[in-house]
């Protein structure tokens, strides 16, 4: 779960709750509270980190920020963000790789393929879906995950 708001035209996370369950066992249970106006964040009511950016994002809200930034700057090749997780605050880059036609549910979708070396993932953004990721591919040492957008409803 990710909760945030826009401050001075920047998306900011305020609360990030991540629970990972594998084979019925809780693997991760992290709660991160971010105080953008005070420039710090706290994880699990224990560790405190200073924030250094006008916008600190979590692992979910970074995709909203990327979608918004690509809409504003479609010709930009690299987008950089400060992203917080249980390990701390890290710089994350999304680099434009190429344009790609993908197929989801037998529908051809024109997309921009972006790569994030830090997150070990690639994603496809589509103008038809307000540049939200329509496919996210993540490969780590043990697993390969693919998330595919299954529903999209634009708010009025």
Predicted regions and their residues:
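Acidic, serine/threonine-rich low-complexity disordered tracts
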Residues: 1-33, 74-156
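Hydrophobic, well-structured mid-protein blocks that either form specific transmembrane helices
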Residues: 23-63
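Short, polar/charged, low-complexity connector loops/linkers at domain or secondary-structure junctions
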Residues: 64-74
């Amino acid at each position: 779960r990710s909760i945030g708001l826009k401050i001075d035209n920047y998306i900011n996370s305020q609360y990030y709750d991540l629970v990972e369950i594998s084979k019925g066992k809780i693997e991760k249970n992290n709660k991160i509270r971010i105080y953008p106006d005070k420039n710090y964040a706290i994880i699990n009511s224990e560790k405190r980190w200073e924030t250094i950016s006008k916008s600190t994002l979590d692992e979910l809200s970074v995709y909203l920020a990327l979608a918004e930034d690509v809409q504003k700057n479609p010709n930009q090749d690299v987008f950089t963000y400060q992203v917080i997780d249980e390990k701390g605050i890290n710089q994350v880059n999304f680099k434009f790789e190429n344009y790609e036609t993908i197929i989801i549910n037998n529908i051809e979708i024109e997309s921009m393929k972006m790569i994030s070396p830090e997150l070990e993932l690639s994603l496809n953004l589509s103008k038809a879906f307000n540049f939200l990721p329509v496919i996210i591919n993540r490969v780590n040492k043990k697993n390969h995950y693919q998330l595919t957008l299954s529903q999209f409803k634009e708010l009025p």
